[in-house]
A protein has these predicted regions:
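Non-ligating segments of multi-cofactor redox enzymes
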Residues: 1-483
């Protein structure tokens, strides 16, 4: 057992309101510069929809992630032959039209235009070429809230029954916030010929070494989530850095800090690195349970001892015990990885959203009178859609999570209204009263330090006296002849 620690984020899709505050805060901090205009390390997508870049989930086109080759994994579009043939050209990489041509407006024309009969306007121009754009063709959330659109929603690869968006009674919508998943088996790192992408041992964050990156762009093609971008100005790859300068000092990510709905939970998970490859080899519908089997109980003395042998500090072990992420992912099995069938073992997890009852199934008030639990097939968001999105097609794990969420609501409704609740409601969902109240607090009134349990980085524990003895005064001696 090789115990490692990873900083992980969980998203509660039931609480996301699609305000894009997280995207704007991330953009203003990290990608507000030339060459990065089209980069959205954090973005929020409307589902069903094509996403950003368009149809990123369609791996038949983009060929990202891993596939099983006998008893081993191999990159879907990579190998010695394809790597050599595509060294200077990436046929599977998203094109500019799959993103959008970044634009701005000539606001100076509003004040500086010549006098005339027409009101001056701020014309759009390309931030890449500087040329005028007559008609804007796209944006980072171009299909925002268009979940019933035949142009966008119908192209969602997770939507098996396209007819559900044809009728107002059956169409549905939910938001999907996305960042880099900082995977345990990152395809971007495996594909890089220069080995510029690495996964940090201390916290699991995946980063790009800008000094080593040669701009081959294999990482952009290999990442199935398309969260690695190419900076056309610097010629380097860039991606979400999980706000590591903040995380290292015990602060949560900018996206989580600014989240209006407080949908994000950040904490430490301990996992068994020896089992990652075997977990990624499982069948699609077994991947969620395989992922969960990798996560270790931080309260287990054997796990704690193994973590200490690998340099995990007591501060991190204490944070792992208090982690809300462990509670949601492992203890209660509510959170699941996004598209585990890509086999990168992503370490960002999502709690599936509840949804209203379909009106086509009858009178809603009769169906739900006095706390009656609705049948899962009557929920507006199809189980199959959520399974395609979060569990590799495994309906059972989605149903188990939804049953717990529904039972939690029924129980807390009874608590708040002082109504009797049948204990079997919680028992059948695998919960008890104490567990229900823990989850209720975590989902509703939990404070900042409950939702974000982030220990400061271990490197700060080094004795300053020893550091001073080995570092000296830091004076750079010049050789003769240097000025």
């Amino acid at each position: 057992m090789d115990v490692r620690a990873q900083i992980v984020m969980v998203f509660n899709l039931d609480k996301c309101i699609g305000c894009h505050t997280c995207s704007i805060s991330c953009k203003n901090i990290w990608t507000d510069r030339k060459g990065a205009e089209y980069m959205w390390w954090n973005n929020v997508e409307t589902k069903p929809g094509v996403g950003y870049p368009k149809q990123w989930e369609n791996q038949e086109r983009f060929k990202g992630g891993w596939v099983v080759d006998g008893s081993k994994l191999k990159l879907k579009a990579m190998g010695k032959g394809p790597t050599l043939a595509n060294m200077f050209f990436q046929p599977n990489m998203p094109k500019m039209e799959d993103y959008y041509e970044p634009f701005d407006f000539d606001y100076g024309n509003l004040a500086g235009a010549k006098e005339g009969d027409d009101q001056p306007v701020a014309e759009a121009f390309s931030q890449i070429s500087g040329k005028k754009i007559d008609e804007i063709q796209g944006g980072p959330n171009w299909d925002d809230d268009l979940s019933g659109s035949q142009i966008y929603a119908a192209k969602d690869s997770n939507l098996q029954d396209k007819q559900v968006i044809d009728s107002y009674d059956s169409m549905f919508m939910q938001y999907l916030p996305r960042i880099c998943n900082h995977c345990l088996n990152p395809a971007c790192a495996a594909s890089c010929p220069s080995r510029a992408i690495y996964k940090r041992g201390e916290d699991g964050i995946v980063l790009v070494d800008q000094e080593v990156c040669k701009g081959w762009r294999f990482c952009t093609s290999a990442c199935p989530y398309k969260k690695v971008y190419f900076n056309w100005q610097s010629g380097k790859a860039e991606k979400c850095i999980f706000c590591y300068p903040r995380v290292e000092t015990g602060q949560c990510n900018a996206c989580a800090h600014s989240c209006v709905g407080r949908i994000r939970y950040v904490g430490v998970l301990l996992y068994d690195a020896d089992g990652v490859e075997a977990a990624a080899l499982k069948k699609d519908d077994e991947l969620v349970e395989a992922h969960r089997s990798l996560i270790l109980d931080p309260s287990d003395p054997a796990v704690a001892e193994g973590a200490r042998k690998n340099g995990v500090s007591d501060q991190w072990l204490e944070a792992a015990v208090k982690s809300p992420v462990y509670t949601l992912v492992k203890e209660f099995g509510l959170a699941m990885p996004l598209h585990p069938e890509f086999r990168t073992v992503p370490m960002a997890y999502y709690i599936p959203s509840l949804s209203p009852v379909l009106s086509v199934w009858g009178d809603t008030h009769k169906l739900l009178e006095h706390g009656m639990i609705p049948a899962l097939e009557t929920l507006r968001v199809p189980i199959g859609y959520l399974a395609s999105l979060l569990s590799g097609g495994n309906h059972r794990v989605i149903e188990e999570a939804l049953k717990k969420l529904i039972a939690l609501r029924v129980f807390m409704r009874g608590e708040n209204l002082k109504l009797p609740v049948d204990p079997a409601v919680l028992q059948e969902a695998g919960l008890d009263e104490a567990a229900a109240k823990r989850l209720y607090r975590l989902f509703t009134v939990a404070g900042y330090n409950e939702r974000n349990v982030i220990p400061a980085q271990q490197r700060e524990m080094q004795d300053p006296q020893k550091r001073r003895q080995t570092a000296g005064f830091g004076i750079l001696k010049k050789t003769r002849g240097d000025k």
